[in-house]
């Protein structure tokens, strides 16, 4: 007689993780940073009274799509036999992105951030705005 258990078989989950993500390093860090980013984003929105469920859902979907991008990178990595280089690079990109987002959220919440970091964030924001303005001018 087969016994049913309510406990999760973590070995099966680990196999699924390796199959989907290729056992790439720092995936756990990306997950933790994504959760911290969501939490700091919610705190920031709450502080500025801009907490909207629709905006939050779009943010959650974006986070989920980041992990889909890692899965896609792993598939391409496997097909092209790149030994995990593309997947690792993709994870590092998203880790850097999450780190920037968390730092921006913390600065807007009012947490003291070293000036060297805030100066670099301001430079990145200015470059983003300049690129967007150039794209808008080119479009029309």
UniProtKB/Swiss-Prot annotation:
<keyword id="KW-1133">Transmembrane helix</keyword>
<dbReference type="InterPro" id="IPR006480">
    <property type="entry name" value="Phage_holin_4_1"/>
</dbReference>
<comment type="similarity">
    <text>Belongs to the bacteriophage holin family. Cp-1 holin subfamily.</text>
</comment>
<dbReference type="Pfam" id="PF05105">
    <property type="entry name" value="Phage_holin_4_1"/>
</dbReference>
<protein>
    <recommendedName>
        <fullName>Uncharacterized protein YqxH</fullName>
    </recommendedName>
</protein>
<keyword id="KW-0812">Transmembrane</keyword>
<feature type="transmembrane region" description="Helical">
    <location>
        <begin position="26"/>
        <end position="43"/>
    </location>
</feature>
<keyword id="KW-0472">Membrane</keyword>
<feature type="transmembrane region" description="Helical">
    <location>
        <begin position="64"/>
        <end position="86"/>
    </location>
</feature>
<dbReference type="GO" id="GO:0005886">
    <property type="term" value="C:plasma membrane"/>
</dbReference>
<keyword id="KW-1003">Cell membrane</keyword>
């Amino acid at each position: 007689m087969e016994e049913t258990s309510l406990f999760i078989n973590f070995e099966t989950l680990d196999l699924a993780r390796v199959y989907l993500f290729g056992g790439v390093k720092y995936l756990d860090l990306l997950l933790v940073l994504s959760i911290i980013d969501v939490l700091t984003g919610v705190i920031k929105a709450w502080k500025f009274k801009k907490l909207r469920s629709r905006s939050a859902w779009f943010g959650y979907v974006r986070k989920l799509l980041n992990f889909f991008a890692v899965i896609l990178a792993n598939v391409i990595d496997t097909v092209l036999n790149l030994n995990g280089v593309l997947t690792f690079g993709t994870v590092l990109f998203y880790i850097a992105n999450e780190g920037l987002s968390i730092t921006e959220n913390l600065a807007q919440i009012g947490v003291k951030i070293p000036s060297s970091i805030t100066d670099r964030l301001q430079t990145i924001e200015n470059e983003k705005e300049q690129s967007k303005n150039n794209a808008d001018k080119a479009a029309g």
